[in-house]
Amino acid sequence: MFPRDARLDMYDPELAKAIAAEVRRQEDHVELIASENYCSTLVMQVQGSQLTNKYAEGYSGKRYYGGCEYVDIAEQLAIERAKQLFGADYANVQPHSGSQANQAVYFALLQPGDTILGMSLAHGGHLTHGANVNVSGKLFNAVQYGVNAQGLIDYEAVESLALEHRPKMVVAGFSAYSQKIDWVRFRAIADQVGAYLLVDMAHVAGLVAAGVYPNPLPHAHVVTSTTHKTLRGPRGGIIVAQAPQEALVKKLQSIVFPGIQGGPLMHVIAAKAVAFKEALEPAFKVYQQQVVKNAKAMAETLMLRGYKIVSGGTENHLMLVDMIGRDVSGRDAEGALGQAHITVNKNAVPDDPRSPFVTSGLRLGTPAVTTRGYQEQDCVDLAHWIADVLDAPADATVIAAVREKVAAQCKKYPVYR
């Protein structure tokens, strides 16, 4: 029925052209969006396998459909590898995304109208941590904490807010915070008010797995994550916990299915299993160590060039460039760097006077360039080129010169050989 040698460019040339252009973009542009990475050819091979054809509602050994004996193997491999990777006693690999993993935990442990205490989106948090434009901020009474004048989480303020509002859940984690989080302190705050502690480690899961960032599992009631970003797997979500009570496990299992999802994506779950196996390899730890070294090199160089980094540096894979007071906005900087084939994203910074669609900041991250093979000196060079463009965002000559240097660097470090 379906020939295995069918060619997309012959059947759907418009789509094939768009895909080919994206492949070229990924090879020819430097990727510095902190939430992006390149997964392996093995991950892509499995995600494009015939497992996409199989419906498998339920869990391994307890499906609502027949013929699941082989996808059961794939899911169980993903579960056991995730548990080994993070030191977990429980893992659910079915969430379709990190946002759905967070949603599952909220619905499992809270009632609509309950109070949650999460990091403000404007100060480095995530939409799903109680932002008023997200369902987490609409269904729940969301109280938000932030960073102090030094750009660091204000734990005293978090504690004060917790004592004042008595949340049912405290949410720790971020999408744009460059320092280490004190999970012990967060658990102590949650315990003071009898709240659950949910940690969203989506951005640092790969660093945690490699032991180069503190593991939240011994301290949180529940931990969620994406499976891409620093973990370098397929796009998806995961829920893990260490020594959870049986009642908590039952709530989490039943809320993922049938609570908020139907059939799991078995081809994605199998790809997660491959990514987790890759993350258990010794080379993955070396990779994550280099991610942090590269981020530090980039942040230090940008600061030497006169650019402010929120919190004064980085201890993970990302940094937030604060351009408040400068003529160039985050949006304009993103556009100018894009012309130089450096891909970044505009980002709000603490106390940003500009709108979220314009912003006064840039978020930069090193997971993708480190996957390509970049070392510290490459990131120092790249940071200088970024500063060159930010110093003269409307200068076509500067942009062209940087674009030429980027092309040579990308050619030196191809994504897929």
Curated annotation (Swiss-Prot):
Locations listed in the record: Cytoplasm
Cofactor(s) it depends on: pyridoxal 5'-phosphate
Record's keyword terms, sorted: Amino-acid biosynthesis, Cytoplasm, One-carbon metabolism, Pyridoxal phosphate, Transferase
Signal peptide range: none
Family as reported in the entry's similarity comment: Belongs to the SHMT family.
NCBIfam families: PRK00011.1
Keyword Transferase in record: yes
Pfam families noted in UniProt: SHMT
Pathway note: One-carbon metabolism; tetrahydrofolate interconversion; Amino-acid biosynthesis; glycine biosynthesis; glycine from L-serine: step 1/1
Record's subunit section: Homodimer.
Primary subcellular site in the record, as a coarse category: cytoplasm
Enzyme Commission number(s): 2.1.2.1
Gene Ontology terms: biological process: glycine biosynthetic process from serine; tetrahydrofolate interconversion
Catalytic activity entry: (6R)-5,10-methylene-5,6,7,8-tetrahydrofolate + glycine + H2O = (6S)-5,6,7,8-tetrahydrofolate + L-serine
Protein known as: Serine hydroxymethyltransferase
GO cellular component: cytosol
Annotated site (Plays an important role in substrate specificity): H228
Keyword Cytoplasm: yes
Listed Gene3D superfamilies: Aspartate Aminotransferase, domain 1, Type I PLP-dependent aspartate aminotransferase-like (Major domain)
Positions of post-translational N6-(pyridoxal phosphate)lysine modification: K229
Residues the entry annotates as binding (6S)-5,6,7,8-tetrahydrofolate: L121, G125, H126, L127, S355, P356, F357
Lineage per the UniProt record: Bacteria, Pseudomonadati, Pseudomonadota, Gammaproteobacteria, Lysobacterales
GO MF term list: glycine hydroxymethyltransferase activity; pyridoxal phosphate binding
Entry function: Catalyzes the reversible interconversion of serine and glycine with tetrahydrofolate (THF) serving as the one-carbon carrier. This reaction serves as the major source of one-carbon groups required for the biosynthesis of purines, thymidylate, methionine, and other important biomolecules. Also exhibits THF-independent aldolase activity toward beta-hydroxyamino acids, producing glycine and aldehydes, via a retro-aldol mechanism.
InterPro entries: PyrdxlP-dep_Trfase, PyrdxlP-dep_Trfase_major, PyrdxlP-dep_Trfase_small, Ser_HO-MeTrfase, Ser_HO-MeTrfase-like, Ser_HO-MeTrfase_PLP_BS, SHMT-like_dom
